[in-house]
């Protein structure tokens, strides 16, 4: 056995090997140590190898999915070695000592999951391959749970943005590539000619022209991905729809840093909660949620396609009764896309067929409702017919399956009564046999006088009589009619001729019934598979309707407006809000302050000043998010919006050290800013916050100054630039398209009041000390800062130099000494108070004295 295991382990390579032994998957050697630690299960031993005990652990087959989930989340890949014959077949083949044949039937990886329990219902699960050829780069992406297959042509500079858009579970590349990948595969699998042949074979075509014009890099990526999926499925290739080829300019370009900064689909920490997607998502199906995430990750550049999406959202927005009817119907839908994916992968169950039946039937009813609409929007008129056309399959599945089919087909019981007369007869025969066995139990009790006698069944003995050990002697007599089979602690088991006869009737009928059901299941599966492409199209149509209805619901909730999209590079937003922050403020019982933004040609660059916590960063981000939502086909959080299409979106807001790559916060900021200056076009939208911080004041100011000039003169894009360098406001004198704005704040009775309102002109002051006091800095520190600030401002007024006057500030200034004396006096006063002896009036007087000492 161990020789067989080692041979399979060599085939599994770097995967953990689940080796099937009866009702368990066993692991040995280093695999056992890794799995035991990861799964928190006992590490035992079995036999010896090279003179040492073999480490071993195992998990039950029936619970394997839960253990697989933990291993995959921990970053492992798992090869499944199943028994490919029964022990009886092995004995017939090679005698009583023959080893049961085993083979690896599947490699489970993060990107190739289809099991419902292992997947997030509301997120796509992409497995991607990166192909390179002649300096070009392409990414092929497949979600094997639904069959989506998409190809993106890019270059090395844009690879990161493409991968960030997909957020893949697994990345595969050639072993000759330097790309950071989850798995590197043989170079030959990424050969473009081999890739073309592999795709032609997969789709049974002589040419790929019907799918588009593929570059060599695209063929390399697609071929490499198909080869990898074939490897993990061990020849049972999962369902892949015809590939969709994406041109580089079909969607808004958003790099990885911008996605992270704006938290489009994932918030800080890698979770959905707190992201734009989380704030917008009102979908009621898993497929709708996955499609919405895709829409937000890749906003469109085609004004016509955006308008078609918006028309559909508007129809549902303007007709709340229709919207609620649709959402109520959609809410009850099963995920037919993923059910189909499991069926195609050979991992389908009777329940998956039941989900197809119920989902397609509900889709048909939904289509009937939509056909009644007068003047439907063009997109709805296009997709509504896709909801129907499955009548014959629905009728077959309705007749064939019970209302709630089981997940496990092994026990039968999923074919409906009346579908197959012969199967019904077998079931009646089996039921008759079970009634006969029940009658025998009553008869045996009467004959023997043993009230505790029971007829039981297990996989080893079959049907048998079981009595307490104290009553077994009565059945041991030769003329009792019972044959002893097994003695256990407390019970003794017997057989009887008439029981054996009845049991044979039940067993044979049951086996024949199971075989008949399995045959029907195979036929039903083949019938469904014949319509897999049409079913996938229906699933897509349902998802699009769910997305539109959900966006309409969100717009109605928040009073959002339909954006107007124009050809020229304008950006006019009235009453704009940040959807995530607004929701958080509302939960806290507050009210979000809306602001306008008008980046017309004459003021396409706004320089925004004002105090920290005043709302500058929120204002910058909210306008970037409005652009994303508009081009995704959504209403936007504003009272009015008129936007020119944005080809590239950049955000340099907030940064942190990238220690893994040896980059400081300032270095990260400069790299991101350099990318913006190199890539932004006049149609781009850029938000920049505090460029230049992290270095000396003069260096930072000089960099910020030069960046503003470059964006104004060279990139000429729409830009919101927030800064604390008030010196930059002088650029308004020489940059005709630069407009000055600030977030308003006021001091009231010594306290800072942040108004979160945007006003024209520069801020009159930074309010830095007020914000520091609001943040809780010690009074002594605030006082010292005031002293330093006064000297700095005096020096600046006298010499024009920022550092003038610093020489007059000793490390331990007089104010600090005075405050130290005040602290000592306060301590002395506190030490002289006998708290237990004070009356309430005396305590209040003492408190006032102490307050006077504290100033």
PLM region descriptions:
Residues 823-855:
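C-terminal tails and terminal domains of large nucleic-acid-associated
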Residues 29-32, 215, 284, 289, ...:
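ATPase nucleotide-binding head domains, primarily ABC-like/P-loop NTPase cores
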Residues 193-197, 202, 252-253, 258, ...:
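Amphipathic heptad-repeat alpha-helical coiled-coil/stalk segments that mediate oligomerization
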Residues 2, 18, 29, 58-68, ...:
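Amphipathic alpha-helical transducer elements in NTP-driven molecular machines
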Residues 44-57, 82, 204-214, 263-266, ...:
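Short hinge/gating elements
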Residues 1-318, 335-341, 345, 403, ...:
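Basic, polar low-complexity surface loops/patches
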Residues 24-45, 138, 148-150, 170, ...:
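A conserved P-loop NTPase coupling/switch region
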Residues 3-7, 14, 525, 539-543, ...:
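Conserved phosphate-binding elements of NTP-dependent enzyme cores
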């Amino acid at each position: 056995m161990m020789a067989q295991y080692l041979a399979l382990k060599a085939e599994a390579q770097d995967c953990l090997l689940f080796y099937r032994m009866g009702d368990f998957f066993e692991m040995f050697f280093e695999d056992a140590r890794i799995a035991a630690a990861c799964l928190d299960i006992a590490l035992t031993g079995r036999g010896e190898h090279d003179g040492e005990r073999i480490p071993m652990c195992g998990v039950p087959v029936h619970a394997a999915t839960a253990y697989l989930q933990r291993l995959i989340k921990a970053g492992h890949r798992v090869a499944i070695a199943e028994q490919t014959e029964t022990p009886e077949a092995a004995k017939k083949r090679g005698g009583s000592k023959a080893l049961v044949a085993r083979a690896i039937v599947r490699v489970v990886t993060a990107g190739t999951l289809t099991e419902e329990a292992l997947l997030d219902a509301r997120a796509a699960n992409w497995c991607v391959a990166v192909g390179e050829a002649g300096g070009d780069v392409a990414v092929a992406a497949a979600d094997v749970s639904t069959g989506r297959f998409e190809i993106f042509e890019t270059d090395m500079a844009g690879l990161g943005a493409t991968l960030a858009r997909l957020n893949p579970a697994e990345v595969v590349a050639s072993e000759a590539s330097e790309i950071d990948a989850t798995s590197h595969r043989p170079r030959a699998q990424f050969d473009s000619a081999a890739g073309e042949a592999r795709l032609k074979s997969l789709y049974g075509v002589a040419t790929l022209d019907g799918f588009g014009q593929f570059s060599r890099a695209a063929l390399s990526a697609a071929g490499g991905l198909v080869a990898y999926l074939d490897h993990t499925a061990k020849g049972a290739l999962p369902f892949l729809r015809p590939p969709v080829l994406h041109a580089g300019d079909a969607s808004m370009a958003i790099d990885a840093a911008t996605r992270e900064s704006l938290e489009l689909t994932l918030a800080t920490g890698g979770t959905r909660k707190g992201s734009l997607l989380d704030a917008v998502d009102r979908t009621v199906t898993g497929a709708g949620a996955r499609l919405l995430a895709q829409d937000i990750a890749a906003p469109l550049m085609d004004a016509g396609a955006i308008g078609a999406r918006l028309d559909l959202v508007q129809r549902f927005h303007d007709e709340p009764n229709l919207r609620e009817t649709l959402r109520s119907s959609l809410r009850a839908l099963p995920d037919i896309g993923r059910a189909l994916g499991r069926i195609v992968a050979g991992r389908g169950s009777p329940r998956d067929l039941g989900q197809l039946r119920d989902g397609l039937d509900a889709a048909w009813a939904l289509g009937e409702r939509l056909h009644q609409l007068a003047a439907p929007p063009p997109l709805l008129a296009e997709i509504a017919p896709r909801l129907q056309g499955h009548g014959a399959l629905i009728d077959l599945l309705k007749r064939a399956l019970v209302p709630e089919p089981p997940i496990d087909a092994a026990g039968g019981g999923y074919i409906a009564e009346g579908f197959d007369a012969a199967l019904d007869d077998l079931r009646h025969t089996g039921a008759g046999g079970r009634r006969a066995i029940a009658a025998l139990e009553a008869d045996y009790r009467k004959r023997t006088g043993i009230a505790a006698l029971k007829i039981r069944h297990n996989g080893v003995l079959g049907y048998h009589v079981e009595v307490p050990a104290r009553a077994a002697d009565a059945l041991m007599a030769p003329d009792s009619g019972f044959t002893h089979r097994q003695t256990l602690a407390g019970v003794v088991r017997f057989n009887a001729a008439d029981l054996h006869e009845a049991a044979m009737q039940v067993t044979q009928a049951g086996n024949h019934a199971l075989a008949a059901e399995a045959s029907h299941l195979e036929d039903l599966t083949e019938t469904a598979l014949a319509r897999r492409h049409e079913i996938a199209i229906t699933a897509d149509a349902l998802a699009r309707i769910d997305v539109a209805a959900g966006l309409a619901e969100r717009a109605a909730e928040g009073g959002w407006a339909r954006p107007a999209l124009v050809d020229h590079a304008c950006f006019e937003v009235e009453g704009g809000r940040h959807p995530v922050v607004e929701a958080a403020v509302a939960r806290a019982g507050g009210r979000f302050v809306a602001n306008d933004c008008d980046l017309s040609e004459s003021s396409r660059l706004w320089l925004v000043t004002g105090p920290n916590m005043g709302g500058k960063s929120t204002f910058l981000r909210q306008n970037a998010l409005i652009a994303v939502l508009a081009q995704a086909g959504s209403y936007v959080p504003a009272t009015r919006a008129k936007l020119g299409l944005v080809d590239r979106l950049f955000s340099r807001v907030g940064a942190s050290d990238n220690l893994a790559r040896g980059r400081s916060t300032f270095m990260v900021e400069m790299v991101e800013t350099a990318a913006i200056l190199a890539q932004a076009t006049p149609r781009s939208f850029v938000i920049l916050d505090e460029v230049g911080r992290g270095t000396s004041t003069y260096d930072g100011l000089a960099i910020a100054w030069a960046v503003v000039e470059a964006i104004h003169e060279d990139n000429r894009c729409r830009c919101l630039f927030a800064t604390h360098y008030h010196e930059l406001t002088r650029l308004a004198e020489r940059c005709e398209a630069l407009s000055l704005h600030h977030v308003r704040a006021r001091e009231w009775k010594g306290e800072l009041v942040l108004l979160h309102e945007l006003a024209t002109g520069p801020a009159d002051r930074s309010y830095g000390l007020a914000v520091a006091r609001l943040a809780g800095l010690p009074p002594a520190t605030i006082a010292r800062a005031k002293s330093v600030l006064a000297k700095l401002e005096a020096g600046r007024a006298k010499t024009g130099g920022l550092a003038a006057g610093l020489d007059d500030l000793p490390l331990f200034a007089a104010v600090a000494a005075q405050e130290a004396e005040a602290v000592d006096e306060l301590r002395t006063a506190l030490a002289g108070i006998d708290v237990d002896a004070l009356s309430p009036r005396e305590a209040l007087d003492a408190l006032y004295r102490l307050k006077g000492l504290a100033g």
